[in-house]
Amino acid sequence: MDDEVLKSITLSSIEERYTELSSSIVLTPSVKLTSPFLIYLIKASQIYLKLECFQYSGTFKARGALSVAKQIPEEEKKFGITAASAGNHAIAAAWAAKVENL
């Protein structure tokens, strides 16, 4: 990411994107990790896990894929999207394409 892109990311832009995606993204739960060994190993007082496995695509990558798909100009949507992945990103990209009718 170049500096211009990074400078354009503001709290307001994050909140806008959250609102834009919220109707299509699952609000997944977080659970507190109760393993004393891992808490000791990581040197943390508390650790929470975000259960993104409950997301429609089974991964947090759905957020990014849908965010990008929503930014595709209308006249370019007829070309669809391509994802170079054999894993979570490809699954999320396919899901985002379906949601956005690409």
Q: Which role does the model predict for each range below?
A:
Residues 1-102:
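PLP-dependent amino-acid enzyme catalytic core
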